[in-house]
Design a protein with these regions (language model features):
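Conserved, well-structured interaction surfaces
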Residues: 41-58, 80-154, 173-186, 190-211
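Aromatic-lined, polymer-binding surfaces characteristic
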Residues: 156, 165, 182, 209-221
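Short, conserved phosphate-binding/catalytic loop or strand-edge motifs used
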Residues: 162-168
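Membrane-proximal, proline-rich intrinsically disordered regions
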Residues: 21-67
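Bacterial Sec-dependent N-terminal signal peptides
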Residues: 1-30
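Short coil/turn linking the two alpha-helices of tandem helical-hairpin repeats
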Residues: 151-152, 158, 229-235
Length: 236
């Protein structure tokens, strides 16, 4: 009987740390920012905007990205692991996944949409209205650029809602139809035109720290590429 009491006492004693730590475990770690945290601070919002650029492909990278010389007559790839080499030797099918950027570009589109819909709510006093408006146009241009890449690679694509989607939506609620090629091109051109007509987007940047950011010259270049693609006989 005494042993049973001792076991019960020991069991109850072992449970104390579990209940004592319950409140501690419920706390959110300091290094895990919420979306509201990001869009209540100028530096965090700027970092988020910079992260949207990360989905832009490096079209000069020879191994895994967009350089097509290796599967054309202009050259050949000797790297066995290269997807271009695998295509040349016929080692591919519809499920190979070579050159597949579908998910990458839609991640960029979603990130840009989140930024566009939330940046106006950033009331950090160090973030001026002019800078906020410029960033918003920058994100809009990035979103249109990712749509351009998708259209160039896949033809008619899914044009996502311009509002932020709830991540808890069911699979059925996330089934959006593909738009026609003409509608896709018109949407991208319209997005580029809105950025070009906006006084908030600079023609170019003077500050060295801003070099590499999208300006109106960048947007005009991508608009021209979109129009050339749409005019190509391959799409008519």
């Amino acid at each position: 009987m005494k042993n049973i009491k001792n076991i019960k006492f020991l069991f109850a004693f072992c449970l104390l740390p579990i209940f004592a730590c319950a409140d501690y475990l419920d706390k959110q770690p300091d290094d895990m920012l919420t979306i509201d945290d990001i869009f209540s601070s100028r530096p965090r919002s700027q970092s988020y905007l910079s992260s949207i650029y990360s989905f832009i492909p490096d079209e000069m990278e020879m191994q895994n990205n967009y350089n097509m010389l290796g599967i054309c007559d202009e050259g050949d790839f000797i790297w066995a692991a290269s997807w271009a080499k695998q295509i040349n030797i016929g080692n591919w099918n519809t499920r190979s996944g070579y050159y597949d950027k579908w998910a990458q570009f839609y991640k960029g589109i979603r990130s840009a949409t989140v930024f566009i819909n939330r940046i106006d709510g950033n009331d950090d006093p160090t973030l001026s209205p002019d800078v906020r408006a410029c960033w918003k146009q920058e994100a809009k241009a990035l979103r249109a650029i990712y749509y351009f890449y998708l259209i160039r690679q896949y033809g008619p694509i899914v044009l996502m809602p311009e509002t932020e989607l709830d991540i808890n939506l069911s699979n059925d609620e996330l089934q959006f139809p593909r738009s026609s090629f003409e509608d896709c091109v018109s949407f991208v051109i319209r997005q580029f035109d809105e950025v070009l007509q906006s006084p908030d987007m600079p023609e170019t940047y003077i500050n060295d720290n801003d070099k590499g950011r999208i300006d109106k010259r960048t947007v005009m270049a991508f608009k021209a590429r979109m129009q050339m693609l749409a005019a190509s006989p391959f799409w008519n």
